[in-house]
Amino acid sequence: MKLKTLQLENYRNYEEVTLECHPDVNILIGENAQGKTNLLESIYTLALAKSHRTSNDKELIRFNSEYAKIEGVLNYRHGTMPLTMFITKKGKQVKVNHLEQSRLTQYVGHLNVVLFAPEDLNIVKGSPQIRRRFIDMELGQISAVYLNDLAQYQRILKQKNNYLKQLQLGQKQDTTMLEVLNQQFAQYALNVTLRREHFIKELESLAKPIHAGITNERETLSLTYLPSIKLSDMSKGEQTLWDEVITLLNDNIKREMDRGVCLFGPHRDDLGFNVNDMDAQTYGSQGQQRTTALSIKLAEIELMNIEVGEYPILLLDDVLSELDDSRQTHLLSTIQHKVQTFVTTTSVDGIDHEIMNNAKLYRINQGEIIK
């Protein structure tokens, strides 16, 4: 899939702008705080109906404006598709082919993106929350079922935590409601856990050879899914696994009541990275951690192509300067002529000349595009 045009109205520091996109590489160059990252963010937001930089949609609306609008025309294997996102201070509206989508789960997945920003280098050494968000953002784009299960899980988790807090404070005495919530919680927790486990296995199978290529076969990468709910054997039947989950929850009702919070579930999952059988988070060098992060991002691109039948759009936010020549070369070999890419940078110095030869350059200055 390729983004043909991108139009912004009152988005961040852009009053009104139209970008005619190059099918291969689009380089956005400018000083800091001019709007380069805002442009990339708008593409990400158009894809996932949420920003990766803020959870408050109001921040996306230009100062002193009533609304923000993002519109993109997508070229894909079946033809052309317009996508629209309209944001007001009361909420947001999304459209596919000019038809409003009542649920975000119906919208997400039409435009697939992979974002690689400097903070993504923290996927290895950062907090478990960063890794859970990474799983959710990528898996959610290729599986509407996962997105729905996750939304239902988060809804019930919130209800359960509220009820546990009331029990802890003595505002409630009856645990019957908690047992009912656990029944629903167990099903969605199991669904999310199984889909995450399958996703990590697929991602690992693609990341391993990529990582080996970058390191000239000197290093071996492995991924380990670390679920909060530890099941004896995930290949068992769903009913058997559900029984295990509900038993765990029921056995720990008193602990959770004492703590006033849910102690088990996918909201406490983590993902481990091992390089040559050593924990990359604890023992990996900065170079090893960056190679691991790049391998994961390149594997994402391939996995989306396998699952969706088309390559996603790649967003590189000021990250090329963080990669040495070898890593840039492997990045180039993955994206060349098949993945539409948007790159932000303050200077073209250090960008591979092959990337430059196949690119369209846009200069960004105070929310305006100077071609």
Curated annotation (Swiss-Prot):
One GO cellular component term: cytoplasm
Subcellular location: Cytoplasm
InterPro entries assigned: DNA-binding_RecF, DNA-binding_RecF_CS, P-loop_NTPase, RecF/RecN/SMC_N, RecF_2
GO biological process: DNA replication; DNA synthesis involved in DNA repair; double-strand break repair; SOS response
Coiled coil region boundaries: none
Gene3D superfamilies assigned to the protein according to its UniProt record, in alphabetical order: P-loop containing nucleotide triphosphate hydrolases, RecF/RecN/SMC, N-terminal domain
GO terms, molecular function: ATP binding; single-stranded DNA binding
Keywords: ATP-binding, Cytoplasm, DNA damage, DNA repair, DNA replication, DNA-binding, Nucleotide-binding, SOS response
Binding site for ATP: G30, E31, N32, A33, Q34, G35, K36, T37
Function: The RecF protein is involved in DNA metabolism; it is required for DNA replication and normal SOS inducibility. RecF binds preferentially to single-stranded, linear DNA. It also seems to bind ATP.
Family: Belongs to the RecF family.
Protein name per its UniProtKB record: DNA replication and repair protein RecF
Organism from which the protein derives: Staphylococcus haemolyticus (strain JCSC1435)
